[in-house]
């Protein structure tokens, strides 16, 4: 099944962006080629932009504290797997402590580093990081891969508490939902939400159908419409019945 996810609010949208960027960063920083490490570094700049939103850190701390207060009363409950509960609570408490230790504006260390700032300003220009534009950066790219990787990891480290917090919140949100099998009649599906508030919608479709879900929602109803794309033409609405799995997630 192919999984598509649709955020219902700006906070979850931001966390999904961070997750995608950190996954890309993790992949490219693990590689050996200098060009792949260039992608890792420019991705780190993107992470800093997204994570630098003024209220992100406080939002994450409030949500983690709310989850901690929700889960803590289940300690000692015989109907709850205590080892799993303690693992989650320990992870939340450690991440809260790490967030509390973050000082200053998120990503400020990348701005204050004049050398990185020069790379960042050139990286937004097409072809702007050629060896004649940034000879010192080109020289750094000739260093052994392990040394480059060590440097990039050092620059990323101050942002890791935000990554850990975002991953916990997204994981708890995803685990809150229960998948149901539904059918989009002639490619279209609607469902009343009865005023319930959800943070995330997941749509899983069989890959062999080669359809693409487009979703929208308000506090009363959600819509899923399926389209198909062939080659380089625009996606078009399908008129076949599409079986899929729908999951609504509510922290």
From Swiss-Prot:
**Keyword Cell division in record:** yes
Q: Which GO terms describe its cellular component?
A: cell division site; cytoplasm
Keywords carried by this UniProt record: Cell cycle, Cell division, Cytoplasm, Septation
* Cell location: Cytoplasm
| A single BP term in Gene Ontology | division septum assembly
Which NCBIfam families does this entry report, sorted A to Z? PRK05287.1-4
Its quaternary organisation is:
Interacts with FtsZ.
Name assigned to this protein: Cell division protein ZapD
Q: Which organism is it from?
A: Burkholderia mallei (strain ATCC 23344)
């Amino acid at each position: 099944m192919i999984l598509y996810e649709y955020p219902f609010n700006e906070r979850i949208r931001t966390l999904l962006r961070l997750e995608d960027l950190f996954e890309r960063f993790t992949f490219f920083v693990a590689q050996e080629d200098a060009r792949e490490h260039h992608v890792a570094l420019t991705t780190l700049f993107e992470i800093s932009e997204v994570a630098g939103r003024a209220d992100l850190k406080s939002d994450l701390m409030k949500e983690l504290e709310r989850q901690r207060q929700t889960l803590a009363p289940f300690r000692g409950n015989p109907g709850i797997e205590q080892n799993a509960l303690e693992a989650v609570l320990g992870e939340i408490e450690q991440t809260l402590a790490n967030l509390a230790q973050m000082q200053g504006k998120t990503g400020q260390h990348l701005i204050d580093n004049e050398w990185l700032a020069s790379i960042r300003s050139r990286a937004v220009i097409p072809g702007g990081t050629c060896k004649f534009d940034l000879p010192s950066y080109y020289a750094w790219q000739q260093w052994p891969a392990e040394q480059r990787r060590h440097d990039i990891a050092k620059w990323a480290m101050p942002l890791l508490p935000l990554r850990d917090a975002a991953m916990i919140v997204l994981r708890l949100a995803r685990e809150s939902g229960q998948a149901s099998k539904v059918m989009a009649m002639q490619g279209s599906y609607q469902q009343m939400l009865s005023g319930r508030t959800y943070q995330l919608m997941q749509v899983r479709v069989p890959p062999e159908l080669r359809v693409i879900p487009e979703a929208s929602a308000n506090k009363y109803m959600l819509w899923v419409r399926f389209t198909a794309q062939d080659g380089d033409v625009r996606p078009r609405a399908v008129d076949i019945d599409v079986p899929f799995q729908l999951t609504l997630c509510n922290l």
